[in-house]
Amino acid sequence: MAFLKDLYKNKVAKDLQKEFAYSSVMQIPKIEKVVINAGIGNAVADKKHLEAAISELTLITGQRPVETKAKKSIATFKLRAGQSIGAKVTLRGDRMWAFIETLFNIALPRVRDFKGISNNSFDDQGNYTLGIKEQIIFPQVVYDDVKSVRGFDVTFVTTAKTAQEAKALLVGLGAPFQKVRGDK
């Protein structure tokens, strides 16, 4: 599963250095980590929803997630401070590259009516956040074992200084962005 890592080292990094005229190899943007976050609203009423989400995220990422807890009590939602309401995983190294490869090449093309990922989800620091609506697009999740369909957020944390650099990095790695009028 090191195909994307090799692609980055051998091709994408060199292309980025030429495109943005970096003077040092250390200036070339790279992906530092991928953070997957799932907020489980049903976990307040029933702990089984949280356990199911954790097991599905474990299957998808190959790493056990950490439970996220509520910071404040909110009476309207019957939520107490410190109560588990979600899960998150931070992927680095080989697991990160394997997840990115699975996401771009297998999972996203399985989305119904998929036209590409949004061009507008970059922040000012060159990070990209993507929302996944259904966990069943991943081949690791068995459709018959899923009790409820839930989504999660995927954040690509990069060393890029601008959104333009981050987009060039992700496009080089094969991210299927939406076509904008005028693009080839």
UniProtKB/Swiss-Prot annotation:
Taxonomically, the superkingdom here is Bacteria
Pfam families the record matches: Ribosomal_L5, Ribosomal_L5_C
GO BP: any one term: translation
Q: Listed GO cellular component terms?
A: ribonucleoprotein complex; ribosome
- Which keywords fit this entry according to its UniProt record? Ribonucleoprotein, Ribosomal protein, RNA-binding, rRNA-binding, tRNA-binding
Spell out the molecular function terms from Gene Ontology.
Answer: rRNA binding; structural constituent of ribosome; tRNA binding
KW Ribonucleoprotein (keyword) present:
yes
Q: Indicate the transmembrane segments per the record.
A: none
Which PROSITE patterns has this protein been placed in? RIBOSOMAL_L5 (PS00358)
Read off the NCBIfam families from this record.
PRK00010.1
Q: Name the PANTHER family for this protein.
A: 60S RIBOSOMAL PROTEIN L11-RELATED
Q: Which HAMAP family match?
A: Ribosomal_uL5_B
Its biological purpose is as follows:
This is one of the proteins that bind and probably mediate the attachment of the 5S RNA into the large ribosomal subunit, where it forms part of the central protuberance. In the 70S ribosome it contacts protein S13 of the 30S subunit (bridge B1b), connecting the 2 subunits; this bridge is implicated in subunit movement. Contacts the P site tRNA; the 5S rRNA and some of its associated proteins might help stabilize positioning of ribosome-bound tRNAs.
Assigned protein family? Belongs to the universal ribosomal protein uL5 family.
- How does this chain assemble? Part of the 50S ribosomal subunit; part of the 5S rRNA/L5/L18/L25 subcomplex. Contacts the 5S rRNA and the P site tRNA. Forms a bridge to the 30S subunit in the 70S ribosome.
Protein name per UniProt: Large ribosomal subunit protein uL5
The organism's taxonomy opens as: Bacteria, Bacillati, Mycoplasmatota, Mycoplasmoidales, Mycoplasmoidaceae
